[in-house]
Amino acid sequence: MPDLKSKTLSSQSLGAAIPPEIVYQILTYQFRDLLRNDHPGTAEKFNENLTTFVKSNLTVNKTFSHICQVLIYRYCNLTTAKRFHGLLQTLKGNRCLCNKIEVADFQELTSIGLGRSSEMNKMIKNLTNETLLEFLMLTKANLREFLACENIQDDLDDNIIKYILSPGKVLSVVDFCGCSGTTFTESFIKALDKYYPNKSIDQYRLEPIQQNYQITCLGLNDCIDLPSHVLWKILKMLPELQKLDLSHTSIDDSTLYHGIPHWKNLTHLSLATCLQVTPRAVLEFFSHHPTITDPDNTSTLEWLNVSVIAHSSSWNEVHTMFLLKKLCQHGHNKTLQYLNIGGLPLHVAPSFGEDPISESTYYYQCRDSLQFIKWNFPKLKSLSIKGNSIPISTLVEFLTPIDQDHPNCAQKLKFLNISGNSYVNKWTIQDSLLYTCSPSLVALEVSFDSWQQIEKLNDRHEIIAYRYKNPNSVIKDISTAEQVKWKCYIDSSYGRRYWLYKTDPFLNRDDLDSKSNLTRYDFEGHKIIEIINQPDFLKFAQSKIMLGCGLVPQSGIRRKLCYRDLKPPVSQFLNRKGAISLGDTPLPIITPTLPRGGWRIIHNEDDNNSHVEDSQNHVNAIPRRNSLLSRPTLRSNNGSSSANPFAINVSPASQIRDGLYWDRSVHDLRELSLQEQRIQELADEQQELRTIANFEETDDEYLHDPDLQRRRSQLHLFESSRSRSGNKTRPSLTGEHSSSASFLSFSHFNHLHKRKNYYFTHPDEFVYDPKDPLTTQRYRLHFEIVNEYQVFGCIERGMYRYYSLKA
């Protein structure tokens, strides 16, 4: 009995000794694995996984209980109105939980059925416009994402829409996916009228009285009833957008070119099936709009969807090639990882060998559209050329890797949509070259007839191809060939889309059906939980932008960009002063960031050197600041220092006279002249909020303060007063007195110490242990998935998955 008691006490003391941050990371991995156990993806399985996590960890100790609350309440998946009502009552009873909610997901909400109708739901009043607004007011301190769907479109009145679009909150991701109808449209128009009170001016010259600098992601997918002038007003209010989904909306040519402001951070854009947009407007947008053409933009496009309906489109081959060339001209081809040009006609040459490649200023020139994409889009991982009839031989040439003489053009394509291709049919789908020509390809999307042919081959619904070591040889040696297995993905929830994927033991398993339908128990009768994820290739097949960060963020980079966390919390459990944290309350961004500034030259001065001070009375005074420089240049001082008789006893540090720095306090008056009054009003409001709530100064305010920048400009860039007195033998910046040994040691140091997150972009260079290749492969896959998460996100459950993967 004493032994049992001592063991219990030792385990409790051990649990208390572990820092909560470490426990948080461990439980985060468990929480992520359980919620990704989503094959097949049903609401019952989600609730079962959540219940398993709560029962396993909630009652261990106080630390586990607090961490479970942080993880569970962060992402609120509201599937029924009754669940929403229960959550609202819980928040009213415990206000500390309000700060833990970051995501409100209504995309799977439905309560119609089981004997209920929409009229009965209105009478129950579990979820109405009043209760929804009350929920938003309670969670405004830390709510980052609001994901709606068509099932709550009638509950989104003008007060809710005005509240969502108004500045002063940390809400960064807004998705109205599928919302339409007369009630929703009238509410949207009424809410926007409050931001555009002056109706006497032409609607295309109107400016909002307030702008929201916090919202970075906006989804209007399938909002078909919103008029074009309403879209104009919405886009004018959001100058800091990074992700914009306008798929299947009523946007027209004028709104596309004149209504979109100059977004410098845009990375994701979807203009799919916008029937009122002409090819000319799209080409003018990609040719002249500063969002695409400005070389000073912070980001370039990484995700682009311009697919159209082929039989009702006026696009031709010249338009498509012109669009691709404009993407290359403005540098987007170097960062694009997703490109959907389904329905756009492509020019197909008889053979790549008959279409010579010539290098020009911005791109490799050729006539064939596929060859142009192959040579000029090296980072592309997902490509859709749906509706184009391309021969199998041309597809094989396109997927075949480029020679090693051009390493910068190496292809990384993983997903290819060739549905609607008349050459890929039930007679040609079994061509083995289509499955073995590309080492990086993991999935193909084909038409139903082709997919059904593979499904009927055997009971396992798979096809096995062989990759030979000498594919060009007449005699094939199957004993040395590599076996490649491709399988049909069967899931009835995705409508009319059919995929073939290459199986592997980690990301795209071939035993999904057998494992998901099998329940196992141990010898004591406890259920064995086996994590079965959806295939990883589905994230490349999505046609809708994933706006948020998902159930559990896999990388801090995406969260930092989407949420604009300028001052992230030091800990989930302790604040910056060391006290117990009940939830992070970040400050919203209500003012634009300062312009980029300009280069200046600052002259070094040595306060401790009296000779230099005396000599300045005999020589011409050198101005403290020069005018802005067009490019960074340093002035040489070798000749002047040797010719100056007063500089005989000057220390080596004082010989460094000129320094170059980037002055962020220089304002672009022309850019800010129209916004000066508005910024001052927003700054006054922010000061009032800070005074009332006693908030601390944010890092953004501290680093972008012009007074701070001017004080910094008076500091010595190359030497401080302490270093001058203690170090008299500073090496020369020109390299005249530096030794080769120090240079070699510095180069060796740089070679051994990689920059932060280096292996996320170069996973193939990572080696965990030369004797353990399996663990090395797992690490490489992890780095690759985290890097892809920044652009593609992850395939979640619910209505988002339906809209993202539907036909």
Curated annotation (Swiss-Prot):
Location of the region described as Disordered in the Swiss-Prot/TrEMBL record: 607-647, 716-739
Function in brief: Substrate recognition component of a SCF (SKP1-CUL1-F-box protein) E3 ubiquitin-protein ligase complex which mediates the ubiquitination and subsequent proteasomal degradation of target proteins. Probably recognizes and binds to phosphorylated target proteins.
Oligomer and partners: Interacts with SKP1 and CDC53. Component of the probable SCF(YBR352W) complex containing CDC53, SKP1, RBX1 and YBR352W.
Name of this chain's protein: F-box protein YLR352W
UniProt keyword annotations, A-Z: Ubl conjugation pathway
InterPro entries, alphabetized: LRR_dom_sf
GO cellular component: SCF ubiquitin ligase complex
Disulfide bonds: none
Biased composition (Polar residues): 627-644, 723-736
Pathway: Protein modification; protein ubiquitination
F-box domain residues: 220-266
Skewed-composition ranges (Basic and acidic residues): 607-616
Biological process per Gene Ontology, one example term: protein ubiquitination
Comment field (misc): Present with 125 molecules/cell in log phase SD medium.
